[in-house]
Regions:
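Active-/binding-site microenvironments in catalytic and ligand-binding cores
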Residues: 1-226
Length: 226
């Protein structure tokens, strides 16, 4: 079994979606100042970095992040590559083996954007007809490798359609170093009461293939993963 950490690092260099507050990490107490311990204050949006969008994000009466069943956030997931297009619609999604799948993670050209120092509006996204196709095929969770599943100048149509039809959205994934295929997704958002979203730690697990070595996180060369 291999474990892949598909969560972006939270740091002050993290790009944020336009209009969201920047992430700030400030020391409250510090050993270097003679305090008893290191304690920091974090200021951030509920939609910073790798995060989950529940229905409450676009509907005041929708389920909040703490009300989502964990069974929805843990289970088999298909990681599919969709490269060479910014607008991912029905035509592109029809090429994917989605029969019987409930969780879909889209690895797109967005993967390169995490290397940029600032937010980029030139990212791949779902179109309205793509969102409609996912609902028709029974997908319950869709993830993507940048900060929004919808185009930058979108009016929320894609978000609302997905969320109103029972899909939750996992945004801000780091899928670099992870090949397309079937995995077990474990996504644990912070349990924010009434939350319209929450940062999440997301990992993928796959079976170790015969003849392979130790299990390493693809985003670091330092520590093997149990």
């Amino acid at each position: 079994m291999k474990i892949y950490d598909i969560t972006v690092d939270l740091s002050e260099e993290l790009p944020v979606f336009p209009g969201d507050p920047p992430l700030r990490i400030e020391p409250v107490t510090a050993l270097a100042r003679g305090d008893a311990a290191n304690v920091s204050r974090i200021t951030m949006s509920t939609h910073s970095g790798t995060h989950l969008d529940p229905p409450r994000h676009f509907n005041d009466n929708g389920l909040s992040v703490d009300q989502l069943p964990l069974s929805l956030l843990v289970g088999n997931a298909l990681l599919a590559e969709v490269k060479g297009t910014k607008a991912i619609g029905r035509t592109e999604l029809e090429q994917l083996p989605l029969k019987g799948e409930e969780r879909l993670l889209l690895k797109t050209d967005n993967s390169r954007l995490w290397d940029l120092p600032r937010f980029s509006g030139d990212y791949s996204h779902l179109t309205p007809d793509g969102a409609c196709y996912l609902v028709e095929t029974g997908i319950k969770l869709v993830g993507i490798d940048y900060l929004s599943v919808e185009r930058l100048d979108g009016d929320g149509e894609v978000h609302r359609f997905l969320l109103d039809n029972g899909l939750v959205i996992l945004e801000g994934l780091n899928l670099n170093g992870v090949a397309a295929g079937s995995y077990e997704l474990i996504c644990l958002p912070l349990k924010i009461r009434g939350g319209d979203g929450a940062p999440a730690r997301a990992i993928l697990r796959s079976r170790e293939r015969p003849g392979r070595g130790a299990d390493f996180d693809p985003h670091t060369t330092r520590w093997p993963l149990a």
